[in-house]
From Swiss-Prot:
A molecular function GO annotation: heparan sulfate proteoglycan binding
Function comment: Thought to act as molecular guidance cue in cellular migration, and function appears to be mediated by interaction with roundabout homolog receptors. During neural development involved in axonal navigation at the ventral midline of the neural tube and projection of axons to different regions. SLIT1 and SLIT2 together seem to be essential for midline guidance in the forebrain by acting as repulsive signal preventing inappropriate midline crossing by axons projecting from the olfactory bulb.
Stretches assigned to the LRRNT domain: 34-61, 273-309, 504-540, 725-761
Domain EGF-like as annotated: residue spans: 927-962, 964-1003, 1005-1041, 1043-1081, 1083-1119, 1124-1160, 1337-1371, 1374-1410, 1415-1451
Name of this chain's protein: Slit homolog 1 protein
Cleaved signal peptide residues: 1-33
Length: 1531
C-alpha cells in the first residue's frame, strides 16, 4: 500500500523517511563533535593524560584512532565504544583498568591495534575479541592476568603480535592459541607458568619472536614436547630454563634430553591439571574449607583473582595489599565477612563492594586509607560491623553511611578526622556502639550537633575528646555544653603534629603547604631549600610551583602532576637536573610555562614532556644539550616560545621543529653550530618561517664563523667526504658492550670489571654473568625497577650490608659460582619481593640465623656445592628450608664428620648438633684473621676486596709476610760500605759507600775532579773522597778564588760598608743600595724619579724617599684627596635624631616615636602611667570630622578621644570594644560599639567619620557601624580642647555624670598616627602630661610563648603570662628553683635550674635573710675611680679595675694599647637594630698618652659590609675600623 503524505507536510516525505533524515543529521553532528578535555584532528581523537576516570561520551562515530592512555580509567563497560565501527587504533595503556565487560569491543570490526598494557586486569573474559577479525596487534603485558582461557582469543584470526609478558599467568588452557595461525610475535616471559599443554604452539608456522624465559617451568614428562619444539627453532625461545625438578634447575629446556623429562607415579599417563577458570579455585598460597578462604600473612600485594564463587568468608589480613580495585568482590555474592585489616591499603574503588547484599562484617582497620569514596558502602543493607579504626581518614561525607540501616558497631577510632558534618549518623538506626576517640576533633560551632547527638544517644564508648580550641582541649565531647561550641576568628584550630586539611562537606580537601615551603594564594614557593626531589604532597589548588635554586637532579615519573589540574607554571631553574623520566609531567595539561634554565640536561626527547599538551613557553637555557633530533619536541603543538640559548648544540635534525605548530619565538643564540651539510635545511627554514630567532650564527667551519645561519648560501653548507650520513639521532639507551631488548640488558661474558655506562634506568633484567667483578657494583642500587640480576661466574669474594639496597622489586638474584665465603647478616635486607636466590657453587660454610628475615617471598634457595658446616648453628636453616621445600634437596653437609654427605633438606633438624666449636677454618671465613695467617709478627686486617690483608714488619714481604728480605748476610759492600736490605717485591739490597767510593758494591774510587771548583787557572788533583787545587802565584784559597792581599784591611778603599772584590786589575767596590761612586762614597739621589703626587715635596732618604703632602692630602704618595664634604653639614635633625650620609644624601635617623624628614613630628606616644593625657587646643571648626588613629593595648577600658562638653563626641575602650558616644544637641545621646575587640596587644586602626547627623565607626578597615541622630549635625568644637588618652579630673567627672562615658579610666598603651581630616597630627603641639613618653615598641619584636604581648611598658613591650608560666617571654614554668623558696626577708635569685640564693633587705643577713642586724659594709669607705669594690676573706675590701686602669683606687690609666676584638658591628636605624652578617676583627684603643696626645687608631681599614636589621630589611655600607693603635695629636 502506498504511503500517504502527512497533513501539514509540504515535502511529501513519509514518517520513516523523516526519521531517517533526522538520524542522518544527528549522526553527522555527532561525527563532528569532540569530547570535553580531548582534541580532535581529522579522524583522530586524543584524550591521553587528561585525568579521565571513565570513557568519555560523544566520541565522533567516524573516529579511526582513539588515544585514551595515561588516564585513571578503572573499568570498560559494554557500551563504552558502541557505534565506533571505523575505529582502527585504540590506546588504553597506562590506566587503572581492572575489568573489561564482554562485548565491549564487539562494534569495532575494523580494529587493528589494541593496547591494554600496564593496567590491573586479573581476568581475561572469553570471547572478548570474537568480532575483531581485523585485529593484528594486541598488547596485554604488565597486568595481573592469572590464566589464559581456551576461548580468550576466539575470533581474532588475523592476530600477528600478542604480548602477554609480565603478568601472573600460571595456567594456559589447552587450545588457547589454536586459532592464531598467523601469529608472528608471542611473549609469555616473566609469568608464573609451570607447564604448558602439548603442542600449544604447533599451529604457528610464521612465529619469528617467542619469549618464555623467567617462568617456573617444571620439566617433567608433560613438558618433554617443548624441548624438541625449541630445538627445531633455535633462534626463538632463548633462555627458557627449567625451575624444577632440582636436578634440572637452571638448565635450558632445549638442552634437556627426552629421557630426563620424567614423571612420578603413573609416569606419562599422568594428566596436566586443567585450569578451573569458570567457578574459581582456591589460590595456591591460601587454604580453603567450609566456604572460608584463609590468605592471612601470605605476603600478598594484591587481592587474588578467580576466587571460589561460593565462599562466604575471606581473610586477607596481615598482607601487603595496597589497593582494592573496582569490582574486586562483586562476583562473590555469598560473602558474609571480609577481613582486610593490617595491610597497606591506601585506595578503595567506589564499586569495590558493589552487590554484596549478604555482607554483615567488613574489617578494614590498620591500613592507610585517607578517603572513603562516595558510595563505597552503597547497597550494603545487611552490614552490622564496620571497623575503620587505625587509618588516616581525614574526612567523612555526610552520606557515607546512608545505606547502613542495620549497622550496630562503627569504629572510626584513631584516624585524622577533624570535623563531622551534621547528619552523618542519622541513617544508622540500629547503631549500638560508636568509636570516635583518638581523632583531632575541632570543637567549633560545626561540631555542636555531635555533642547533642551523643548526649541523646550515649553510644560512644571510647571517650572522644576535643583537640582544639585550647579552651576545650582534652574535654569529652559528650560532656561539653552546647553553648561552648562556637566559631571565633580569634581562636586557632590548627593542631600541631597533624596535617592541616581545609575540608568541606564533600571532602574536597587540599593538603597544607609542603614542609619548609611558603604558600601564598595559589603560589607554592619552595625555592632555595636544597631540595633533592619535588615534594610529594602539593595543594591541588596550586597554579604556580617554584622549585628553582635547589639540588634536584632527576625528575621521576611519580604521577604527581595528575592531581594538579590548576597548575599553570613550573619553575625548575638553577637545579642539577640531568634526567627527566618519560611521563614525569603526565597529567599536567594545564601547564603553560616550564622553566628548566641552568640545569645539566644533555639531550631532550619527546617522552620527557609527555602530558604538557597546553605548554606555551619552554625555557631550556644554559644546559648542556648538544643535539636536537626530530623526536625532541613531538607533541608540543601549542608551544609559542622555545629557548635553547647557551647550550652545546652543534647540529639539528631536519624537521625537529615541524611539530611545534604554534611556534613564534625560537632562541638559538650562543650555541656552537657546525654549519655543514647537515644544517643546510635550517638556514632555508629560518628564512621562510616568520618567527623571532635573534639570528643564530655559525661557529664552524672557520670561513663561516660568526655569520648568521640565514645569511649562508645553500652551497656553503658543505660536508667532508664520508660525513654526509652523520646525523643527529637520539643515543641508544644501551651500553656498547651489552645487548638490550625492551627492558632486558645482557652484558654476559664481556670481561667487565665495572658496570658499563648507559644502562637504561628502567631496566628490569640485568645479566652480568661470566665477567671479572670482584664486588657487587654499587651503582645497582640506582636501578629501582630491577627484577632479575645475574652475577654468576664472577670473582665476587664478599658482600656488604648495602650491596642490594633499594631493590624492592627484585625477584631473582643469581650469585652462583663466585668466591663467596661469608654472607653478612643484613646482605638481603629489604628484598621483600625476592623469590629465587642462588648461592650455588661458592665457599659458604655457615649462614647467620635471621639472614632471610626480610625475604618473605623467597620460594627457591640454591645453596648446593657449598661446604656447609652442619652443626647447631645451621639447625635453623634445616628447619627453614623444610618449610615449603625452599631448597630442592641438592645442598649437602661437608662437616662435622658425622654429618658429611647428608642432605640439608632431608636430615632431621635434631641431628644438627654442636660437639664443640667449629674448626678455625670455618670460623675464619667470616673472620679470616682468626686463623692468624700473617707470619713473622705481621698485623692482620679484614679487607672486603682481598678477604684479609697483612701489614708486614721490616724485613718481610708476601701475602702472609712469609718472604725474608735479609739480602745483606754476605756483606756484599766493599771499602767499608754499609749494606741496606730493600723492602718490596725485588728483595734486593743497596750499599751506602764511604766518601771517595761508588758503584753497586763500593768498588770504584770516585773521580772527585769531575765536578771540581778550581778557578783562575787552578789545576785539580784527585784524592780519596776529595781533591786539591794547585793555584797560580797571584791567587789563593781552596779553589784559587781569592786574589792576594788586594782587599786587606789596610788597603780596602770601599766606604759605607761596601764589599771589596779583588780582581787582576785591582780592587773593585760593590756598593750597598743608596750609594754610588768608585769607592761608594756618594749618596744616591732617590728623588730623581720620584712619584709624589698633588704637589707633594720629595725628601731623599737612604735608598728610598718620602713624600711630604700638601694640606688635606694623604697616602704614601699623597694620592688620597681630601675627604668630600659630609652631606650632613647644614642639615638639622630635630628631637635628638642623628644625621647619616647615605649616598651623598643626608638622612635623619629618628628616635622612637618621631617622624618627618627632619624628625620634627612626634607621631606615636606611649601612655605609661595612669591618669595621663594629651590636650589639643588649636583646633578648627570643621563641618565634618574624619578621625583615624592606631591603638595598641592589653587593657579592657580606657579613654581614646574626647571633645566638647554638652555637645560632645567621646571615643573610649569599653570591655575591649570601641564605644562611640555622640550628642549633637538632642536627648538622649546615642552610642555605638564595635563588633571587634582590640585589646589583644596588637595595633588596630580605628576610623571615625561624622557627616551631618551620621557617625560611622570602622575597625581595621572592616564593615562600618553606623549611627544616625536627628538632632543638629555635629562639628568638631574648636572652643573645647580635644583630649587624647584621658582628660582632667573635672572634665572626666562631668562626662561620667552625664553618661557620656561609661568608664573614666585613662588609656594605658600606645597611640600612633592620629589623623584629623586626613592631616597627620604632631603630638609635640599638645599639652603632654607626665607619664606620656614618645614612641611605641611594637610587639612584633617580642615573642610570648605562653602569654599575651602588651606594647605599653616603659622599657618596651611586656608579656602577660598565663597561669603556671613566667619569665621574660612566658617560657619558664613557675615551679623553678624559686618556687616555694625559703628567703624570709629578701628576694630569691635563681643560680641555675635547681639552686637559688637570697638577696637580703637592708637590716637582715644570713643565708635565708632571717638574722636581724645588717652586716657592716666593707666597701663603704672605698671609692674606686675606674672599677668596682670587691670584698674577700683574704684581701678584705679592694678595687677591681676596669680594663686599661690600675692602682689601688684604679686611678692610673694604662699606656696606650690596642685590645683585639672580634664581634659583629651594630648600628641603629630608626627603631631597627642592624648588625653585620658576619663578625669582623679590629682593635679597641685604650690607655693614656704622655703630654697632650690621645690614644687613637694609627692605621684604619675600610671595608664594605652587609647589614641585616631586626625589621627584616638589609643594606650595604662602608665601615672603618682601627687595626693599629698609638699616641697622636688629639683630633
Amino acid at each position: 500500500m502506498a504511503l500517504t503524505p502527512q497533513r501539514g507536510s509540504s515535502s511529501g516525505l513519509s514518517r520513516p523517511e523523516l526519521w531517517l533524515l533526522l538520524w542522518a543529521a544527528a549522526w553527522r553532528l555527532g561525527a563532528t563533535a569532540c569530547p570535553a578535555l580531548c582534541t580532535c584532528t581529522g579522524t583522530t581523537v586524543d584524550c591521553h593524560g587528561t585525568g579521565l576516570q571513565a570513557i568519555p561520551k560523544n566520541i565522533p562515530r567516524n573516529t579511526e584512532r582513539l588515544e585514551l592512555n595515561g588516564n585513571n580509567i578503572t573499568r570498560i563497560h559494554k557500551n563504552d565504544f558502541a557505534g565506533l565501527k571505523q575505529l582502527r587504533v585504540l590506546q588504553l595503556m597506562e590506566n587503572q583498568i581492572g575489568a573489561v565487560e564482554r562485548g565491549a569491543f564487539d562494534d569495532m570490526k575494523e580494529l587493528e591495534r589494541l593496547r591494554l598494557n600496564r593496567n590491573q586486569l586479573q581476568v581475561l573474559p572469553e570471547l572478548l575479541f570474537q568480532n575483531n577479525q581485523a585485529l593484528s596487534r594486541l598488547d596485554l603485558s604488565e597486568n595481573s592476568l592469572q590464566a589464559v582461557p581456551r576461548k580468550a582469543f576466539r575470533g581474532a584470526t588475523d592476530l600477528k603480535n600478542l604480548q602477554l609478558d609480565k603478568n601472573q599467568i600460571s595456567c594456559i588452557e589447552e587450545g588457547a592459541f589454536r586459532a592464531l595461525r598467523g601469529l608472528e610475535v608471542l611473549t609469555l616471559n616473566n609469568n608464573n607458568i609451570t607447564t604448558i599443554p602439548v603442542s600449544s604452539f604447533n599451529h604457528m608456522p610464521k612465529l619469528r619472536t617467542f619469549r618464555l624465559h623467567s617462568n617456573h617451568l617444571f620439566c617433567d614428562c608433560h613438558l618433554a614436547w617443548l624441548s624438541q619444539w625449541l630445538r627445531q627453532r633455535p633462534t626463538i625461545g632463548l633462555f627458557t630454563q627449567c625451575s624444577g625438578p632440582a636436578s634440572l634447575r637452571g638448565l635450558n629446556v632445549a638442552e634437556v634430553q627426552k629421557s630426563e623429562f620424567s614423571c612420578s607415579g603413573q609416569g606419562e599417563a599422568a594428566q596436566v591439571p586443567a585450569c578451573t577458570l569458570s567457578s574459581g579455585s582456591c589460590p595456591a598460597m591460601c587454604s580453603c574449607s567450609n566456604g572460608i578462604v584463609d590468605c592471612r600473612g601470605k605476603g600478598l600485594t594484591a587481592i587474588p583473582a578467580n576466587l571460589p564463587e561460593t565462599m562466604t568468608e575471606i581473610r586477607l589480613e596481615l598482607n601487603g595489599i595496597k589497593s582494592i580495585p573496582p569490582g574486586a568482590f562483586s562476583p562473590y555474592r555469598k560473602l558474609r565477612r571480609i577481613d582486610l585489616s593490617n595491610n597497606q591499603i591506601a585506595e578503595i574503588a567506589p564499586d569495590a563492594f558493589q552487590g554484596l547484599r549478604s555482607l554483615n562484617s567488613l574489617v578494614l582497620y590498620g591500613n592507610k586509607i585517607t578517603d572513603l569514596p562516595r558510595g563505597v558502602f552503597g547497597g550494603l543493607y545487611t552490614l552490622q560491623l564496620l571497623l575503620l579504626n587505625a587509618n588516616k581518614i581525614n574526612c567523612i561525607r555526610p552520606d557515607a553511611f546512608q545505606d547502613l540501616q542495620n549497622l550496630s558497631l562503627l569504629s572510626l577510632y584513631d584516624n585524622k578526622i577533624q570535623s563531622l558534618a551534621k547528619g552523618t549518623f542519622t541513617s544508622l538506626r540500629a547503631i549500638q556502639t560508636l568509636h570516635l576517640a583518638q581523632n583531632p576533633f575541632i570543637c567549633d560551632c560545626n561540631l555542636k550537633w555531635l555533642a547533642d547527638f551523643l548526649r541523646t544517644n550515649p553510644i560512644e564508648t571510647t571517650g572522644a575528646r576535643c583537640a582544639s580550641p585550647r579552651r576545650l582541649a582534652n574535654k569529652r565531647i559528650g560532656q561539653i555544653k552546647s553553648k561552648k561550641f562556637r566559631c571565633s576568628a580569634k581562636e586557632q584550630y590548627f593542631i600541631p603534629g597533624t596535617e592541616d586539611y581545609h575540608l568541606n562537606s564533600e571532602c574536597t580537601s587540599d593538603v597544607a603547604c609542603p614542609h619548609k615551603c611558603r604558600c601564598e594564594a595559589s603560589v607554592v614557593e619552595c625555592s632555595g631549600l636544597k631540595l633533592s626531589k619535588i615534594p610529594e604532597r602539593i595543594p591541588q589548588s596550586t597554579t604556580e610551583l617554584r622549585l628553582n635554586n635547589n639540588e634536584i637532579s632527576i625528575l621521576e615519573a611519580t604521577g604527581l602532576f595528575k592531581k594538579l589540574s590548576h597548575l599553570k607554571k613550573i619553575n625548575l631553574s638553577n637545579n642539577k637536573v640531568s634526567e627527566i623520566e618519560d611521563g614525569t609531567f603526565e597529567g599536567a595539561t594545564s601547564v603553560s610555562e616550564l622553566h628548566l634554565t641552568a640545569n645539566q640536561l644533555e639531550s631532550v626527547r619527546s617522552g620527557m614532556f609527555r602530558g604538557l599538551d597546553g605548554l606555551r613557553t619552554l625555557m631550556l637555557r644554559n644546559n648542556r644539550i648538544s643535539c636536537i633530533h626530530n623526536d625532541s619536541f613531538t607533541g608540543l603543538r601549542n608551544v609559542r616560545l622555545l629557548s635553547l640559548y647557551d647550550n652545546h648544540i652543534t647540529t639539528i635534525s631536519p624537521g625537529a621543529f615541524d611539530t611545534l605548530q604554534a611556534l613564534s619565538t625560537l632562541n638559538l643564540l650562543a650555541n656552537p653550530f657546525n654549519c655543514n651539510c647537515q644544517l643546510a635545511w635550517l638556514g632555508d627554514w629560518l628564512r621562510k618561517r616568520k618567527i623571532v630567532t635573534g639570528n643564530p650564527r655559525c661557529q664552524n667551519p672557520d670561513f663561516l664563523r660568526q655569520i648568521p645561519l640565514q645569511d649562508v648560501a645553500f652551497p656553503d653548507f658543505r660536508c667532508e667526504e664520508g660525513q654526509e650520513e652523520v646525523g643527529c639521532l637520539p643515543r641508544p639507551q644501551c651500553p656498547q658492550e651489552c645487548a638490550c631488548l625492551d627492558t632486558v640488558v645482557r652484558c654476559s661474558n664481556k670481561h667487565l670489571q665495572a658496570l658499563p655506562k648507559g644502562i637504561p634506568k628502567n631496566v628490569t633484567e640485568l645479566y652480568l654473568d661470566g665477567n671479572q667483578f670482584t664486588l657487587v657494583p654499587g651503582q645497582l642500587s640506582t636501578f629501582k625497577y630491577l627484577q632479575l640480576v645475574d652475577l654468576s661466574n664472577n670473582k665476587i669474594s664478599s658482600l656488604s650490608n648495602s650491596s642490594f639496597t633499594n631493590m624492592s622489586q627484585l625477584t631473582t638474584l643469581i650469585l652462583s659460582y663466585n668466591a663467596l665465603q661469608c654472607i653478612p647478616p643484613l646482605a638481603f635486607q629489604g628484598l621483600r619481593s625476592l623469590r629465587l636466590l642462588s648461592l650455588h657453587g661458592n665457599d659458604v660454610s655457615t649462614l647467620q640465623e635471621g639472614i632471610f628475615a626480610d625475604v618473605t617471598s623467597l620460594s627457591h634457595l640454591a645453596i648446593g656445592a657449598n661446604p656447609l658446616y652442619c652443626d647447631c648453628h645451621l639447625r635453623w636453616l634445616s628447619s627453614w628450608v623444610k618449610t615449603g621445600y625452599k631448597e630442592p634437596g641438592i645442598a649437602r653437609c661437608a662437616g662435622p664428620p658425622e654429618m658429611e654427605g647428608k642432605l640439608l633438606l632431608t636430615t632431621p633438624a635434631k641431628k644438627f648438633e654442636c660437639q664443640g666449636p667449629p674448626s678455625l677454618a670455618v670460623q675464619a671465613k667470616c673472620d679470616p684473621c682468626l686463623s692468624s695467617p700473617c707470619q713473622n709478627q705481621g698485623t692482620c686486617h679484614n679487607d672486603p676486596l682481598e678477604v684479609y690483608r697483612c701489614t708486614c714488619p721490616s724485613g718481610y714481604k708476601g701475602r702472609n709476610c712469609e718472604v725474608s728480605l735479609d739480602s745483606c748476610s754476605s756483606n756484599p759492600c766493599g771499602n767499608g760500605g754499609t749494606c741496606h736490605a730493600q723492602e718490596g717485591e725485588d728483595a734486593g739490597f743497596t750499599c751506602s759507600c764511604p766518601s771517595g767510593f761508588e758503584g753497586l758494591t763500593c768498588g770504584m774510587n770516585t773521580d772527585d775532579c769531575v765536578k771540581h771548583d778550581c778557578v783562575n787557572g787552578g789545576v785539580c788533583v784527585d784524592g780519596i773522597g776529595n781533591y786539591t787545587c794547585q793555584c797560580p802565584l797571584q791567587y789563593t784559597g781552596r779553589a784559587c778564588e781569592q786574589l792576594v792581599d788586594f782587599c786587606s784591611p789596610d788597603l780596602n778603599p770601599c766606604q759605607h760598608e761596601a764589599q771589596c772584590v779583588g780582581t787582576p786589575e785591582g780592587p773593585r767596590c760593590e756598593c750597598v743600595p743608596g750609594y754610588t761612586g768608585d769607592n761608594c762614597s756618594k749618596n744616591q739621589d732617590d728623588c730623581k724619579d720620584h712619584q709624589c703626587q698633588n704637589g707633594a715635596q720629595c725628601v731623599d732618604e737612604i735608598n728610598s724617599y718620602a713624600c711630604l703632602c700638601a694640606e688635606g692630602y694623604s697616602g704614601q704618595l699623597c694620592e688620597i684627596p681630601p675627604a668630600p664634604r659630609n652631606s650632613c653639614e647644614g642639615t638639622e635633625c630635630q628631637n635628638g635624631a642623628n644625621c647619616v650620609d647615605q649616598g651623598s644624601r643626608p638622612v635623619c635617623q629618628c628616635l622612637p616615636g618621631f617622624g618627618g624628614p627632619e624628625c620634627e613630628k612626634l607621631l606615636s606616644v606611649n601612655f605609661v602611667d595612669r591618669d595621663t593625657y594629651l590636650q589639643f587646643t588649636d583646633l578648627q571648626n570643621w563641618p565634618r570630622a574624619n578621625i583615624t588613629l592606631q591603638v595598641s593595648t592589653a587593657e579592657d577600658n580606657g579613654i581614646l578621644l574626647y571633645n566638647g562638653d554638652n555637645d560632645h563626641i567621646a571615643v573610649e575602650l569599653y570591655q575591649g570594644h570601641v564605644r562611640v558616644s555622640y550628642d549633637p544637641g538632642s536627648y538622649p545621646s546615642s552610642a555605638i560599639y564595635s563588633a571587634e575587640t582590640i585589646n589583644d596587644g596588637q595595633f588596630h586602626t580605628v576610623e571615625l567619620v561624622t557627616f551631618d547627623q551620621m557617625v560611622n565607626l570602622s575597625i581595621d578597615g572592616g564593615s562600618p557601624m553606623t549611627m544616625d541622630n536627628f538632632g543638629k549635625h555635629y562639628t568638631l568644637n574648636s572652643e573645647a580642647p580635644l583630649y587624647v588618652g584621658g582628660m582632667p579630673v573635672d572634665v572626666n567627672s562631668a562626662a561620667f555624670r552625664l553618661w557620656q562615658i561609661l568608664n573614666g579610666t585613662s588609656f594605658h598603651g600606645c597611640i600612633r598616627n592620629l589623623y584629623i581630616n586626613n592631616e597627620l597630627q604632631d603630638f609635640t603641639k599638645t599639652q603632654m602630661k607626665p607619664g606620656v613618653v614618645p614612641g611605641c615598641e611594637p610587639c612584633r619584636k617580642l615573642y610570648c610563648l605562653h602569654g599575651i604581648c602588651q606594647p605599653n611598658a616603659t622599657p618596651g613591650p611586656v608579656c602577660h603570662c598565663e597561669a603556671g608560666w613566667g619569665g621574660l617571654h612566658c617560657d619558664q614554668p613557675v615551679d623553678g628553683p624559686c618556687h616555694g623558696h625559703k628567703c624570709v626577708h629578701g628576694k630569691c635569685v635563681p643560680l641555675d635550674a635547681l639552686a637559688y640564693s637570697c638577696q637580703c633587705q637592708d637590716g637582715y643577713s644570713g643565708a635565708l635573710c632571717n638574722q636581724v642586724g645588717a652586716v657592716a659594709e666593707p666597701c663603704g669607705g672605698l671609692q674606686c675611680l675606674h672599677g668596682h669594690c670587691q670584698a674577700s676573706a683574704t684581701r678584705g675590701a679592694h678595687c677591681v679595675c676596669s680594663p686599661g686602669f690600675s692602682g689601688e683606687l684604679c686611678e692610673q690609666e694604662s699606656e696606650c694599647r690596642g685590645d683585639p676584638v672580634r664581634d659583629f658591628h651594630r648600628v641603629q636605624r630608626g627603631y631597627a637594630i642592624c648588625q653585620t652578617t658576619r663578625p669582623l676583627s679590629w682593635v679597641e684603643c685604650r690607655g693614656a698618652c704622655p703630654g697632650q696626645g690621645c690614644c687613637q687608631g694609627l692605621r684604619l681599614k675600610r671595608r664594605k659590609l652587609t647589614f641585616e636589621c631586626s625589621d627584616g630589611t638589609s643594606f650595604a655600607e662602608e665601615v672603618e675600623k682601627p687595626t693599629k693603635c698609638g699616641c697622636a695629636p688629639c683630633a
